[in-house]
A protein has these predicted regions:
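C-terminal motif of bacterial Sec signal peptides marking the signal peptidase cleavage site
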Residues: 18-22
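Surface-exposed edge beta-strand/loop patches
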Residues: 140-175
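Acidic/polar, low-complexity intrinsically disordered N-terminal segments immediately downstream
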Residues: 25-85, 91-92, 175
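Sec-dependent N-terminal signal peptides
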Residues: 4-14
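Positively charged n-region of N-terminal signal peptides that target proteins for export
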Residues: 1-5, 24
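Short beta-strand segments
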Residues: 91, 129-131, 163-168
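Mature extracytoplasmic domains of secretory-pathway proteins
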Residues: 74-125
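Short, solvent-exposed, Trp/other aromatic-anchored flexible loops in extracytoplasmic proteins
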Residues: 114-151
Length: 175
């Protein structure tokens, strides 16, 4: 009986000490290889810290509102069609990736699209823009030719909206 109690105490002590030394959910892990690529109508950022910030804060207050109208994968490009209120002097889009490819079949990865607008006048009209991502240029170079990305499903998320039944994230595959 003493032996059972002794092992129970040891087990409890080990469990508690492991729980106290485990990683804190808010601990910031630095991205070892952040990457920024400026394109004609968007900026592509591979940055896990920024990705987590966007994921945590996604809302109309965090990203200026816009809609993702359509996402298509055409050959080695992804076309993200967005619409947003007209009347802004500047509309900058960021495509944010954390660099993670989920090991599933087919593999999956997630992207956020964020809009920053400036000098806006109220308007009922909408502008449309297509953000064309050259997947080979960005992902294959970053992942040293990782063949998994050729077949990956990309889940594209709007940083100005929280996901719910009417605002689902949009998956797109090469099929």
């Amino acid at each position: 009986m003493k032996r059972v109690i002794f092992f129970a105490i040891i087990f409890s002590a080990v469990t508690i000490s492991l729980g106290l030394t485990s990683c804190d959910k808010d601990t910031e892990i630095k991205d070892p290889n952040p990457f920024t690529l400026q394109k004609e109508n968007y900026t592509f950022l591979k940055n896990s810290n920024y990705y987590l910030e966007v994921q945590k804060n996604r809302s109309p207050e965090y990203s200026d509102p816009f809609e993702i109208e359509d996402v298509q994968r055409i050959d080695k490009e992804m076309h993200i069609e967005v619409s947003f209120p007209a009347g802004c002097a500047s509309n900058n889009f960021e495509i944010i990736w954390d660099g993670v490819v989920m090991e599933s079949y087919p593999p999956q990865t997630r992207l956020f699209v964020k809009r920053t607008a400036g000098n806006c006048n109220k308007s009922d009209e909408r502008e449309h823009r297509v953000l064309v991502i050259d997947l080979e240029e960005i992902f294959v170079k970053l992942r040293q030719g990782d063949p998994h990305l050729q077949d990956a499903i990309f889940i594209v998320s709007n940083a100005s909206k929280r996901p719910d039944t009417s605002n689902a994230d949009m998956p797109v595959s090469n099929n």
